[in-house]
UniProtKB/Swiss-Prot annotation:
Its cofactor is Zn(2+). Optimum temperature is 55-65 degrees Celsius. Optimum pH is 7.0. Its EC number is 3.4.-.-. This is Zinc metalloprotease TldD homolog. GO terms for molecular function: metallopeptidase activity; protein homodimerization activity; zinc ion binding. The gene is tldD. SUPFAM superfamilies: Putative modulator of DNA gyrase, PmbA/TldD (SSF111283). It is an enzyme of class 3 (hydrolase). One of its GO terms (cellular component) is cytosol. Homodimer.
Length: 443
């Protein structure tokens, strides 16, 4: 590949890199009335150059000197591109563990799950169970004499169930992903199904919450999505510059016990493993909030240079066809030192929110999440389950309203979409106690 890098330099490029990627993907989906199986192999190259301080980018299924010339001939921009350059490095890595199962074994495992889902509750009307895995080989080369070779795999399982009793319709879901082997070998699927069953029962019999502002206990799954959606996206440098956080850099936005980071990898089966990003940058911890102070943002090479911040390794692309974007990896709130019982102390009327079903945030810092498992709290005790719960608020106000952080920790994993690109991400945290949060229903 370096001969093509050299060709770009001979043509006047001040920087060039090439990514090669080969992905073997397998998918099995089973619903109440059909089965769908697919396979695919996707393979190709991306070429990127800086020429006259403009970007050039091209995706191709083959690489030749003509492709290099064509990339330079189609540069775009405003002649302001500046990036962080890195020292020479050659590395070969193995990411996670292999998936040693054939197609028949995967289909049989999914049929077993489907038969169990059918018996979770008599009110179930439909379900969708999707298994997906991929085996990948990636290579990265740059004009800095960087060569990074990576092999790995990932597998995921998503289960969506719809149940109806009378005029009450509920939807519950569970998503798991791992890079530590075959997902049925990594997780206790019986526990996953038990969680779904509990949510179906609670949603069907649950009451809607009384709208208003209340003290709230957020469980790790909800803390994870809050950290990802309300903090993480606003801390991606390309979003940050137009959002509410940029002007608050190096200022206090929470108590000194508040710490939020994004890591390339964690010691957890649901961790995403991003040791190098798609710009060949080594991943490092990004201390977004440290002891309550907003410290730094996730960057790619361009925004690292723009902000004067060391590169973080957050440039990720869905495939070789895509220009890399600033994306999260493992975004989480660090545990505190309180027990779970301490968090509930003193709550006369409030809510305990356990599992989200979706969420979104805006660049001005407002967020809203739907909750699929939650309970009313009265006099520090967990009471009846609820359904159709929604929470909303402002990111900075909510951070400042965190009163206590527990010492436990949990992670969730899934997929995040940004500008049409989807990548695997993970998030998590402990239980937290929020002094006041807006709670309501959703339809």
């Amino acid at each position: 590949m370096f001969k093509y890098i050299k060709k770009a330099e001979e043509l006047g490029a001040s920087f060039a890199d090439i990514r090669y990627e080969r992905v073997i993907a397998n998918e099995v989906t089973i619903t109440e009335d059909r089965k769908y199986v697919s396979h695919g192999v996707d393979e190709g190259y991306s070429i990127r150059v800086i020429y006259n301080r403009n970007w050039g980018f091209k995706a191709t299924d083959k690489i030749t000197e003509n492709e290099i010339e064509d990339t330079i001939n189609h540069i775009y921009g405003d002649e302001r591109v500046n990036i962080v350059y890195l020292p020479s490095k050659h590395d070969t890595i193995k990411i996670g563990k292999d998936i040693n199962k054939n197609e028949e074994e995967k289909i049989n495992d999914l049929h077993k799950v489907a038969s169990q889902v059918n018996t979770l509750h008599p009110s179930i009307k439909s379900y969708s169970i999707k298994y997906y895995d991929e085996i990948f080989h990636k290579e990265y080369y740059s004009s800095e004499d960087r060569e990074i070779i990576a092999d790995g795999s990932s597998s995921s399982l998503s289960i969506l169930v719809v149940a109806r009793e009378g005029d009450v319709t509920v939807e519950v879901s569970e998503i798991l992903s791992t890079q530590m082997g075959y997902i049925f070998d990594v997780f206790d699927i019986n526990q996953v199904l038990a969680n779904l069953q509990k949510r179906i029962i609670n949603q069907l019999k649950g009451s809607t919450p009384k709208a208003g502002e209340y003290p709230v206990i957020l469980a790790p799954e909800v803390v994870g999505i809050f950290t990802h959606e309300a903090i993480g996206h606003l801390s991606e440098a390309d979003v940050t510059l137009n959002g509410s956080l940029y002007k608050l850099r190096n200022k206090r936005i929470g108590d000194e016990f508040l710490n939020i980071s994004d890591l390339p990898a964690m010691d957890h089966p649901q961790s995403s493993l991003v040791y190098y990003d798609d710009e060949g940058v080594e991943g490092r911890e990004v201390k977004i909030i440290e002891n309550g102070i907003l410290k730094e943002f996730m960057t790619d090479r361009y925004y690292s240079a723009y902000l004067g911040q060391p590169p973080t390794g957050n440039a990720r692309a869905q495939s070789y066809r895509n220009f890399s974007l600033i994306r999260m990896r493992n975004t989480y709130m660090k545990p505190g030192d309180a027990s779970l019982n301490e968090l509930f102390e003193g709550i006369k009327e409030g809510y305990y929110l356990v599992s989200p079903i979706g969420g979104e945030t805006s660049s001005n810092g407002t967020f809203q999440f739907a909750i699929q498992e939650g309970y009313r709290v009265e006099n520090s005790e967990i009471k009846e389950p609820l359904r159709n719960i929604g929470i909303s608020g402002n990111t900075i106000s909510t951070l400042n309203a965190i009163e206590m952080i527990s010492k436990d920790f949990g992670m969730s994993s899934g997929f995040c979409e940004k500008n049409g690109q989807t990548v695997q991400v993970s998030n998590g945290g402990p239980h937290i106690k929020v002094k006041k949060l807006k709670v309501g229903g959703y339809v």
